[in-house]
């Protein structure tokens, strides 16, 4: 409960006001078919956030949970939601919101896999797709809805999505969801849910303003917060290259590729125009490149992501659209062609490179004007970004 105060466990790595830690899936009192789905999905034992968050969520408590990118946040609320769903009740019982269509689709995929042996229906209600499909899904009955705020609110307003049986409201990437761009939509949706609805927020970062906002619609939440100065990404080697000025970045990128052998890489830029510029330039140098940004039609985005996942494209250039939650297994290198404008997006970007302990390398292109921002990032995450060594190629052999 909020009034209990925060205690530290695990040598200060985690702050929490909830003492129960469960070290095996078998001890979480889950439906046997969920455990079967968990093992089938490839999990052997719960991650740190799963050990602490699944139990209070399945007990119906409001939960504010924070963990690093790639530590199993999605499975945390997936397992919990599947446990709480009444399989005999065909109405919507759980609503999960995500900031991007891609993340919503990935969450749907995880729910489908872990819930493989349950009689549970899940539907992604996202912008850029046919409204007719949404309407048909809601009319036929769907127990878990994963969606983006705009489309979900539209379906509720049009009365196709009936919220009277919703008992769980889950926000993934809460720092992004509660930023100014989504806050109003979230509030509008929340006001249309039953007063007894359980609220669960999960995110990699929890700035103070977000923590304050959560008090408006959470009831004595269990808080499980990774201390900020421990919020570096294990397994990710972080480097910077001082390119001095913007005009030198492209030549630096080509020189870098001459010295390393990389299976696949994600390159982040801050604007759509920069993504398009860099894509054109790299294709001119005969690189196999894909590009993705928010203005692309949904079908095109899906095709591009599938091509990259299958390995037919070696370089994916993206804006921060991709930075939250998209798990591309083979990525060993992330390049910040531009440092993120928002330092809280840094962890989401470089987290693409080494999820669940897989090693990765992040290289930041830094102009003279960027040095201050890089120092801010280092301070914010209590980390050190080292100058790229001359023998960088050895890290990829």
Swiss-Prot record:
GO CC annotations on file: cytoplasm
Protein name: ATP-dependent RNA helicase eIF4A
Motif Q motif boundaries: 23-51
Superkingdom, natural source: Eukaryota
Keyword Hydrolase: yes
Functional note: ATP-dependent RNA helicase which is a subunit of the eIF4F complex involved in cap recognition and is required for mRNA binding to ribosome. In the current model of translation initiation, eIF4A unwinds RNA secondary structures in the 5'-UTR of mRNAs which is necessary to allow efficient binding of the small ribosomal subunit, and subsequent scanning for the initiator codon.
Principal location class: cytoplasm
UniProt-listed InterPro entries: DEAD/DEAH_box_helicase_dom, Helicase_ATP-bd, Helicase_C-like, P-loop_NTPase, RNA-helicase_DEAD-box_CS, RNA_helicase_DEAD_Q_motif
